[in-house]
């Protein structure tokens, strides 16, 4: 009887494991011999692969994809926004391009406050006053001119064709458009005339044509940055600003320049991480968390064990305090990078973490002791020579500020919301930030975008990044930990359920199946608080050499791509 009972228990355990494995099963990563492109929109992925096939390098492909996404992924792909590009060249050189939007010269620290000093709801997220000076065109052209091999005309041509002739919408495309139907209905003369079909929401199988955007892209193709920052497009942008209550002028456009910076770098268990420096907080926070976790036996503790999750949550909590307190535009703020990236500092944080008691966010301050919108897009590319590019760029919210530079087809960002409108008041992503990120003329707002490249022995092994507002950092981090600490293959690491802690609010957001019920109970007994998932990220990742770190290649394939299934428009594609 005893043996029978044991056998039944064993069978029940086996069945539950089998059911879990069926639920959690991932497809194999996409393999290719000569190069790989992973983007959030399948047509853009194909554009990138065609550039690689024609002899272009990873930077050429990144530029072509950037322009193509402005057409086929208008919710976040853009030429009216900005972003970051991390580059690791095959010869070992690495660099970072900052084409983040800037505050207009007329911007002031209190521009979104009423007479009583309270934040005016929606002022920094909707309308022309919410728009920062766009940087995407400057960034793409800087990258192409310095690191690319193809002509501007060759790289913009696919985007022009897609805008001029249109492309057939699939379900994922219309799902994205439907998120802003009410906004388009309010702006029927401009965005509504483009992103609705004769006044009705688009349906799958219908064709989206963007003639004004095609004309703008032709001007950029012919004149480079002058096709956007001067002349017809600039005149229409400035006129739209003036008519709509915005403050961007021609002087703002004239002064915009892409910055080339040294990336943030750190080491984790034998791998070298190359990521985004300020005005991104991404690389700093990822490295700070990794430095903390490196002192714990994460592999031995096991994937999403109570102890491992507890340590990770607490590391996130402490690192986000520093993010929100210290970091800002390096032209205006002295960012204490050496201190935040110091492994001795990480050791002090570990000493402050109670192994079985959650920290209380409101009591954690920057330093020790005590501790001193999803709505973006990311793509990853590696070419046959090993050049790697990781790009995250954005309009901030879906479809940005919900306004256009009229007559240009260009949707404009609402990036001003990423500044601190008022110390202690959260932005759209719930981030509470400090004076270091205050609004000021010509300043670039702090960002969470984290385009990241991981190397070993000087060669690229991983390219990874995601959209998702403040969740970008933790989603990128967890994907890397899943491979480095837990031995997952690339697609498993991307698919795995995630959790997110950003200091404030107190609760940690968890996706379905991220924690088993008993693990969650243990963590709650230690004082951890949990809330449901936030909007999904979309990881776009590439591994070089094998489907998993330290694994064996499949056939002749050298490149392996993983597209996040959480959004249904993307594609990993190689050749």
UniProtKB/Swiss-Prot annotation:
InterPro entries: GGT_bact, GGT_CS, GGT_lsub_C, GGT_peptidase, GGT_ssub, Ntn_hydrolases_N. Keywords: Acyltransferase, Glutathione biosynthesis, Hydrolase, Periplasm, Protease, Signal, Transferase, Zymogen. PROSITE patterns: G_GLU_TRANSPEPTIDASE. L-glutamate binds at residues 100, 394, 396, 415, 418, 447-448, 468-469. Pathway: Sulfur metabolism; glutathione metabolism. Residues 1-24 form the signal peptide. Cleaved by autocatalysis into a large and a small subunit. Its EC number is 3.4.19.13, 2.3.2.2. GO terms for biological process: glutathione biosynthetic process; glutathione catabolic process; proteolysis. It is found in: Periplasm. The active site is at residue 376. One of its GO terms (cellular component) is periplasmic space. One of its GO terms (molecular function) is leukotriene C4 gamma-glutamyl transferase activity. Belongs to the gamma-glutamyltransferase family. This is Glutathione hydrolase proenzyme. It comes from Pseudomonas sp. (strain A14). The lineage of its organism: Bacteria, Pseudomonadati, Pseudomonadota. The gene is ggt.
């Amino acid at each position: 009887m005893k043996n029978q009972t044991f056998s039944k228990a064993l069978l029940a355990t086996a069945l539950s494991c089998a059911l879990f494995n069926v639920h959690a099963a991932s497809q194999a990563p996409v393999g290719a011999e000569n190069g790989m492109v992973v983007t959030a929109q399948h047509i853009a992925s194909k554009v990138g692969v065609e550039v690689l096939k024609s002899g272009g390098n990873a930077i050429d492909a990144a530029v072509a994809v950037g322009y193509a996404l402005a057409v086929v992924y208008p919710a976040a792909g853009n030429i009216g926004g900005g972003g970051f590009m991390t580059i690791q060249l095959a010869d070992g050189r690495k660099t970072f391009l900052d084409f983040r939007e800037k505050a207009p010269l007329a911007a002031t620290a209190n521009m979104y406050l009423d007479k009583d000093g309270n934040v005016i709801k929606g002022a920094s997220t909707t309308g022309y006053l919410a728009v920062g000076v766009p940087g995407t065109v400057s960034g793409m052209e800087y990258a192409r001119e310095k690191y690319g091999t193809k002509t501007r005309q060759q790289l913009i041509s696919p985007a022009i064709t897609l805008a001029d002739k249109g492309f057939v919408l699939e379900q994922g495309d219309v799902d994205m458009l439907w998120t802003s139907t009410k906004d388009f209905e309010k702006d029927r003369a401009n965005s509504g005339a483009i992103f609705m079909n004769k006044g009705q929401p688009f349906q799958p199988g219908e064709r989206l044509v963007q003639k004004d955007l095609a004309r703008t892209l032709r001007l950029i193709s012919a004149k480079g940055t002058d096709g956007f920052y001067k002349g017809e497009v600039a005149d229409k942008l400035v006129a739209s600003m003036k008519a709509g209550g915005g403050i961007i002028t021609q002087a703002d456009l004239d002064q915009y320049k892409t910055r080339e910076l040294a990336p943030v770098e750190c080491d984790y268990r034998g791998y070298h991480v190359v990521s985004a420096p300020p005005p991104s907080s991404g690389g700093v926070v990822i490295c700070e968390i990794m430095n903390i976790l490196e002192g714990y036996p994460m592999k031995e503790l096991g994937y999403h064990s109570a102890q491992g999750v507890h340590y990770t949550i607490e590391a996130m909590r402490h690192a986000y305090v520093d993010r929100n307190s210290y970091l800002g535009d390096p032209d205006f703020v002295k960012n204490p990078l050496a201190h935040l990236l110091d492994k001795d500092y990480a050791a002090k944080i570990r000493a402050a973490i109670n192994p079985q008691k959650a920290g209380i966010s409101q009591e954690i301050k920057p330093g020790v002791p005590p501790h001193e919108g999803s709505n973006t897009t990311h793509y990853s590319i590696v070419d046959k020579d090993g050049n790697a590019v990781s790009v995250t760029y954005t309009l901030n919210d879906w479809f940005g500020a919900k306004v256009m530079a009229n007559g240009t087809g260009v949707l404009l960002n609402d990036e001003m919301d990423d500044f601190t409108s008022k110390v202690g008041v959260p932005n759209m992503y719930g981030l509470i930030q400090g004076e270091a990120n205050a609004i000021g003329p010509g300043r670039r707002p702090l960002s969470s975008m984290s385009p990241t490249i991981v190397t070993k022995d000087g060669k690229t092994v991983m390219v990874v990044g995601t959209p998702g507002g403040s969740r970008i950092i933790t989603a990128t981090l967890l994907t890397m930990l899943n491979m480095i600490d837990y031995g997952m293959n690339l697609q498993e690491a991307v698919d795995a359920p995630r959790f997110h802690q950003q200091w404030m609010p107190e609760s940690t957001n968890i996706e379905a199946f991220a924690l088993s019920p008993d693990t969650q109970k243990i963590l709650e007994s230690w004082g951890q608080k949990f809330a449901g998932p936030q909007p999904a990220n979309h990881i776009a990742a590439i591994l070089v050499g094998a489907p998993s770190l330290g694994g064996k290649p499949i056939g002749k394939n050298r490149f392996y791509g993983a597209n996040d299934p959480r959004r249904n428009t993307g594609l990993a594609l190689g050749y």
